[in-house]
């Protein structure tokens, strides 16, 4: 799909499908819209009246028009109340238009949307993101794709002439989101630790990033006993991925994104039983997928920020070599961990990844992981949990969430809860009592960051959508890429 920019007035546009956005309870046709309705022989007013269209957010109505009108189809989309108008409103409204246009076999859509905050650049970028994310289709694993009908070929953004840079930025970010979606959606026999390392190498080759892949023996030399303990049972070699983007000159900040990378999680010897969703555990590398997606986007945008993209990637499998419940592992900072549940493995891999990252002398680290079901119980499917002792970093991430539309909610890091992780024979256990499980998981990770501002994002909910939700169809969402890119780009 091509996105074109036009300075053609709404009254002069002619083509296949015209899409117009209206605010809730402000659907009266005055000014330019009144003139357009007159030109269209009252079709707009008739559509609003007959369909009882009120402009509710993301609601749409559609009609075909007679041959004497300069457009063949009309879509009206609601923006909700004016006082609730956000940049995300445009993203979701554009997605709604794209879906209706595709369903109605529109080839070319002329899109008339208002500006958010009088900012044509941010508005154009958001619209382009919403359209592309909504219309993305993943048919890689279908021999005969179901969705092979008419596709939207071109969308013209009316009144956005000169915003080529905004569209280019949207394309760069969306390319990272789609990479993350593809990695998460692919089954575990398609995306393995080896595949993830090859993907990172391809990003480095395509965009000039530095890369280091630590093999098992390299990790052994660094004392990564927690990560390697999880990797013991797999027949596939673990891969510790470290991509680095460095700008020309002196960077204004040095940051790291660390993603959990379990390409499949069986639960280990504490195997996931019937009804546990074990068949969905290909998604347990959603953090690493977002990390690589962010790397792809950042490498194209080229900000004046040094960014490290790190993931310890392996499977959590079952074999005679597997770690046992009750084993004691030693992480690379010397801390010992009693494994009281082999299905709490993600935090073990992250422990060594965080120790490694903490030694790089950075300004801040953000890790993201499909870490706990407890976070999903607390916040549902749309919202990631934010855990950090650093108020400034929390504020940066909350602002990035607001701009990107990827929701987060700051959760407490109640230090008293660490009592539940104490072990009688090691420094700590890898799980605590059931209450506050997402908090104790974050407190566990906190033990492996000593010198750097740090935040943890538990993305177990929003990494996957069971049903259509805005610009996310059912399946992998690519959650985290846009949030992290906005964080990196923030001043």
UniProtKB/Swiss-Prot annotation:
Cellular component GO terms held in the UniProt record: cytoplasm
Organism: Nostoc sp. (strain PCC 7120 / SAG 25.82 / UTEX 2576)
Keyword Manganese carried by entry: yes
A GO term for molecular function: metalloaminopeptidase activity
Signal sequence range: none
One Pfam family hit: Peptidase_M17_N
Binding residue positions for Mn(2+) 2: 260, 265, 284, 345
Gene that produces this protein: pepA
Catalyzed reaction equations: Release of an N-terminal amino acid, Xaa-|-Yaa-, in which Xaa is preferably Leu, but may be other amino acids including Pro although not Arg or Lys, and Yaa may be Pro. Amino acid amides and methyl esters are also readily hydrolyzed, but rates on arylamides are exceedingly low; Release of an N-terminal amino acid, preferentially leucine, but not glutamic or aspartic acids
Protein name as annotated: Probable cytosol aminopeptidase
Enzyme Commission no: 3.4.11.1, 3.4.11.10
Origin organism lineage: Bacteria, Bacillati, Cyanobacteriota, Cyanophyceae, Nostocales
Family classification: Belongs to the peptidase M17 family.
Function, in words: Presumably involved in the processing and regular turnover of intracellular proteins. Catalyzes the removal of unsubstituted N-terminal amino acids from various peptides.
InterPro entries associated with the record: Leucine_aapep/pepB, Macro_dom-like, Peptidase_M17_C, Peptidase_M17_leu_NH2_pept, Peptidase_M17_N
């Amino acid at each position: 799909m091509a996105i074109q920019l036009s300075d053609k007035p709404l009254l002069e546009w002619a083509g296949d499908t015209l899409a117009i956005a209206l605010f809730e309870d402000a659907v009266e046709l005055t000014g330019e819209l009144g003139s357009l309705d007159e030109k269209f022989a009252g079709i707009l007013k008739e559509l609003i009246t007959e369909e009882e269209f009120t402009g509710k957010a993301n609601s749409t109505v559609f009609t075909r028009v007679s041959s004497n009108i300069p457009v063949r189809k009309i879509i009206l989309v609601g923006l909700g109340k004016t006082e609730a108008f956000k940049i995300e409103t445009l993203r979701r409204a554009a997605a709604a238009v794209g879906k209706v246009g595709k369903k109605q076999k529109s080839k070319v859509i002329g899109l008339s949307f208002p500006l958010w905050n009088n900012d044509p650049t941010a508005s154009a970028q958001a619209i382009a993101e919403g359209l592309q994310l909504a219309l993305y289709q993943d048919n890689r694993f279908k021999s005969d794709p179901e969705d092979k009908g008419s596709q939207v070929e071109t969308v013209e953004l009316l009144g956005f002439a000169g915003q080529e840079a905004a569209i280019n930025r949207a394309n760069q970010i969306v390319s990272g989101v789609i990479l993350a979606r593809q990695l998460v959606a692919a089954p575990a026999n398609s995306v393995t630790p080896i595949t993830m390392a090859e993907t990172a190498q391809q990003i480095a080759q395509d965009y000039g990033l530095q890369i280091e892949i630590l093999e098992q023996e390299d990790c052994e030399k660094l004392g990564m006993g927690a990560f390697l303990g999880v990797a013991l049972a797999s027949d596939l070699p673990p891969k510790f991925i470290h991509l680095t983007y460095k700008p020309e000159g002196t960077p204004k900040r040095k940051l790291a994104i660390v993603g959990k990378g379990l390409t499949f999680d069986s639960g280990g010897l504490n195997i996931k039983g019937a009804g546990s969703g074990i068949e969905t555990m290909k998604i347990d590398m959603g953090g690493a997928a977002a990390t690589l997606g962010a790397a792809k986007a950042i490498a194209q945008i080229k900000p004046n920020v040094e960014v490290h993209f790190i993931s310890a990637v392996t499977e959590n499998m079952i074999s005679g070599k597997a770690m046992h419940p009750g084993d004691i592992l030693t992480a690379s900072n010397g801390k010992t961990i009693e494994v009281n549940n082999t299905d709490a493995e993600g935090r073990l891999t992250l422990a060594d990844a965080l120790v490694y990252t903490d030694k790089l002398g950075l300004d801040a680290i953000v890790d993201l992981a499909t870490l706990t079901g407890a976070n999903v119980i607390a916040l549902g499917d749309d919202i990631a949990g934010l855990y950090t002792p650093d108020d400034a970093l929390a504020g940066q991430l909350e602002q990035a969430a607001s701009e990107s539309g990827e929701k987060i909610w700051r959760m407490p890091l109640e230090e008293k809860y660490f009592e539940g992780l104490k072990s009688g024979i090691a420094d700590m256990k890898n799980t605590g009592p059931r209450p506050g499980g997402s908090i104790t998981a974050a407190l566990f990770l906190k033990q492996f960051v000593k010198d750097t501002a740090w935040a943890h994002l538990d993305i177990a909910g929003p990494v996957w959508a069971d049903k259509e939700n805005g610009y996310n169809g059912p399946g992998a969402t690519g959650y985290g890429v846009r949030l992290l890119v906005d964080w990196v780009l923030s001043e």
